[in-house]
């Protein structure tokens, strides 16, 4: 399940050029949906929620928990605390920006009932983003972030924990949140609004999803090693049946 962060009424952060985060989230999520379905994940569902911030969180968790989803992936774009914003003028309007930070980040909650599986996909996604030449956002371990400061779980790839985030904590399936990049950074905003960057990010998600599903469908060593019934001879290695591919 692909969750489009925020709503048309509660649009999230505002970009350096005065565009709502919700629009960035929707366009990227739609591209990821296309990429996943083209890769064979036909059951991919796009979740677009209406309402204000708090009620939409409750709604999206309720919808996710009512469906047989194997994974919940929330799509967002990043900003900075208000104290780090600077002023500039764009097209005759006084706006805010911060070029101090850039990059993606991947988030999980250690309070999710499927935390280990959530972390497994988060690691795959972060590695896939890094493999595309993207850098992760390092600032979330810094005191300057105030109450946005969070512990990092993987310093190599940019996986963080946000234990109390509702959509990560209360979903009953593995849940991960992707901050695809910073839209308050003037240069990165332009990149995030390009088809090229949306293709790069959606490709990383699809690559991570394939590895995630392949690992889950592989036979467990303890199951493969079980002793066959006594009245049936054990199959020779070259005769053993291959596991069927799992429908995505």
For each predicted feature, which ranges?
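Short glycine-rich His-centered loop
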Residues: 1-18
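Active-site-proximal helix/loop segments of hydrolytic enzymes
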Residues: 23-248
């Amino acid at each position: 399940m692909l969750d489009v962060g925020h709503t048309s009424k509660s649009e999230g952060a505002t970009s350096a050029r005065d565009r709502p985060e919700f629009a960035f989230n929707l366009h990227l999520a739609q591209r990821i949906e296309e990429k996943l379905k083209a890769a064979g994940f036909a059951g991919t569902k796009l979740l677009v929620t209406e309402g204000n911030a708090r009620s939409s969180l409750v709604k999206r968790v309720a919808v996710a928990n009512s469906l047989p989803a194997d994974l919940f992936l929330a799509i967002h774009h990043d900003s900075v605390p208000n104290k780090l914003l600077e002023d500039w003028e764009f097209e005759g309007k006084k706006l805010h920006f911060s070029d101090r930070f850039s990059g993606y980040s991947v988030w999980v909650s250690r309070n999710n009932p499927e935390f280990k599986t959530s972390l497994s996909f988060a690691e795959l996604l972060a590695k896939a983003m890094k493999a595309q030449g993207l850098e992760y956002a390092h600032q979330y371990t810094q005191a300057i972030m105030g109450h946005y400061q969070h512990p990092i779980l993987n310093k190599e790839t940019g996986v963080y924990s946000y234990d109390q985030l509702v959509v990560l904590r209360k979903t009953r399936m593995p849940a991960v949140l992707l901050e695809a990049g910073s839209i308050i950074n003037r240069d990165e905003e332009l990149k995030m609004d390009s088809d090229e960057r949306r293709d790069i990010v959606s490709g990383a998600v699809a690559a991570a999803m394939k590895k995630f599903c392949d690992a889950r469908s592989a036979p467990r060593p303890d199951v493969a090693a079980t002793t066959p019934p006594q009245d049936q001879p054990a199959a020779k290695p070259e005769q053993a049946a291959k596991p069927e591919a799992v429908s995505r």
